[in-house]
């Protein structure tokens, strides 16, 4: 069972309802030797960098014109050459790609390699790219990205199960990018699932996306590695630098040129189809933690996972497990006292689940069931149970028969001088210490 909870003393939100948390009916008088304690009830929705909806994956992380964003989101997708999960920066929707999608850019090297194996020109072939003027080139220089070994390496990765499972490969979409042929002095386009970024010499901004619309500031996205770009080195000396291509420089912290047969890191970009994605979350069942990077959760309604509903008043989650033979986990993610928090447990049968923390407002939590298949996580989001009473509504007077002549009295503060009687709170109360009721005081709380 996964249980992560960071408690902090602070504001307690006390509402009208039942005195005993979780009771279905009945009130219990608050006797003098009983106390109501301040509780860590500052519960809110998780932050966007640890839980992002499909819409947020397309909009919340897009860098601005300066190449930065206050929200820097990461996603785990695929495996790198070191056989560890590959992290990617989330860059937002590419308007040049149809449907719901997001660009992602490798946050660390996925592998290493050469731009080209040799400093030699090649005869032009159709597969090397389509020239925007409708013509073609006779010969490609060694720094021609379309004809490069770097591009061949990326094409191989995109279809290699050692890097991306079959299911992951179906999410990767081709992007058409334009690159300059310095030898022919014109632009050409290539279309691939994985592609290298663009960056001109001495720049501190790299560009991603089908029309280079996404700009990436060095200090935020690419200061730590030297990796190949698709841009050739452009020189005023004809032919002098046909064997040099651009890459990032950690020493000079900008784009520089290197000979094509040198070995550098490979940090490509790709585009993910989000049409079947529900959300992304940094919750990891494997580690039992909220990680630095999120993982996609795809629609699992046809995966036999089951369904879940939650009741805000009862603080209860009902799970109807499906017939899948795969492991199913219940996840509850939220923020408590400013700290990202999760609760999770495996679901082996249909059951009712109560969180071990009485102060959690389920209406502010993200709740779902999930299972993993072929490297992807599939989820079914919980829905709120129909019926029940809104949390802000006083309920005790509707359910309890008071003694003859007694009435409910609304109060907006807790006063130790309250006389014997039946009370409910008309407003939230900031409780900084314990409160002890007097004899005969019955206080109705919503637990």
Language-model regions: role of each:
Residues 1-10:
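N-terminal secretory signal peptides that target proteins for export/translocation
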Residues 10-32:
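Sec-dependent N-terminal signal peptides of Gram-positive bacterial secreted proteins and lipoproteins
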Residues 14, 18, 255-266, 435-438:
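Extracellular interaction modules
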Residues 24-44, 283-285:
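Sec-dependent signal peptide cleavage junction
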Residues 41-327, 331-372, 376-384:
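Collagenous Gly-X-Y triple-helix signature in extracellular proteins
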Residues 367, 385-422:
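Extracellular "leader-to-stem" segments immediately downstream of a signal peptide or signal-anchor
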Residues 420-441, 447:
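N-terminal extracellular ligand-recognition/capping segment immediately after the signal peptide
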């Amino acid at each position: 069972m996964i249980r992560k909870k960071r408690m902090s003393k602070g504001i307690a939100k006390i509402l009208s309802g039942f005195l005993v948390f979780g009771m279905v009916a009945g009130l219990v008088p608050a006797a003098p030797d009983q106390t109501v304690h301040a509780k860590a009830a500052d519960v809110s929705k998780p932050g966007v960098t640890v839980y992002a909806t499909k819409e947020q994956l397309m909009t919340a992380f897009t860098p601005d014109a300066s190449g930065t964003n206050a929200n820097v989101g990461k996603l785990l997708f695929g495996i790198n050459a070191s056989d560890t999960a590959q992290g990617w920066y989330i860059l937002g929707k590419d308007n040049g790609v149809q449907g719901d999608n997001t660009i992602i850019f490798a946050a660390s090297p996925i592998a290493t390699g050469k731009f080209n194996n040799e400093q030699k020109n090649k005869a032009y072939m159709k597969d090397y790219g389509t020239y925007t003027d409708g013509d073609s080139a006779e010969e490609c220089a060694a720094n021609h990205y379309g004809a490069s070994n770097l591009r061949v390496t990326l094409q191989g990765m995109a279809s290699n199960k050692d890097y991306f499972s079959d299911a992951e490969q179906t999410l990767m979409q081709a992007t058409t990018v334009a690159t300059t042929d310095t030898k022919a002095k014109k632009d050409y386009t290539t279309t691939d699932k994985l592609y290298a970024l663009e960056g001109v010499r001495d720049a501190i901004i790299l560009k991603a996306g089908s029309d280079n619309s996404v700009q990436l500031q060095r200090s935020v996205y690419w200061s730590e590695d030297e990796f190949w770009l698709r841009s050739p080195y452009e020189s005023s000396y004809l032919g002098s630098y046909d064997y040099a291509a651009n890459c990032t420089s950690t020493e000079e912290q900008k784009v520089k040129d290197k000979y094509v047969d040198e070995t550098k890191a490979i940090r490509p970009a790709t585009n993910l189809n989000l049409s079947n994605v529900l959300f992304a979350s940094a919750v990891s069942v494997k580690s039992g933690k909220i990680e630095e990077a999120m993982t996609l959760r795809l629609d699992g309604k046809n995966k036999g996972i089951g369904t879940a509903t939650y009741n805000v008043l009862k603080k209860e989650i009902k799970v109807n497990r499906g017939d899948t033979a795969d492991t199913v986990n219940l996840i509850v993610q939220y923020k408590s006292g400013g700290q990202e928090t999760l609760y999770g447990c495996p679901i082996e049968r249909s059951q009712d689940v109560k969180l071990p923390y009485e102060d959690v407002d389920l209406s502010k939590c993200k709740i779902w069931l999930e299972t993993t298949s072929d490297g992807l996580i599939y989820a079914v989001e919980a829905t709120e149970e129909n019926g029940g009473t809104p949390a802000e509504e006083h309920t005790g007077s509707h359910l309890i028969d008071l003694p003859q002549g007694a009435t409910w009295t609304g109060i907006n503060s807790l006063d130790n001088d309250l006389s014997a009687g039946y009370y409910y709170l008309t407003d939230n109360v900031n409780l900084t210490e314990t409160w002890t009721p007097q004899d005969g005081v019955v206080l109705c709380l919503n637990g």
